[in-house]
């Protein structure tokens, strides 16, 4: 698998298998497979460093919206060791309640840094 293919795989699987996963053991296994040990995840709510912090954050986030699903909006894009994907989250078969953009940097085939941008909600 090329570096570009691995980055596309990470973009495709991260939302579902980390942030969309309700089972703690499966989520933790995905984190260990997808993220470097010293990973940094930067969100509007804070910065999380390492597998434990990411697992706790993703689990807490999932608990607030257990019935929401993540869907990709458009095609992921990759340039060298970086990738982006736009996404939405909400109830299945309904318009997303919120949307965002993930930007990730890959090192040695794993996500080293993830930046999560949330779009302003319209009301």
Question: Which residues does each PLM region occupy?
Answer:
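A broad detector of the eukaryotic-type serine/threonine protein kinase catalytic domain
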Residues: 16, 39-40, 119
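A solvent-exposed, acidic/Ser-Thr-rich amphipathic alpha-helical stretch
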Residues: 8, 27-81
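A general structural-boundary detector
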Residues: 18, 41-44, 91
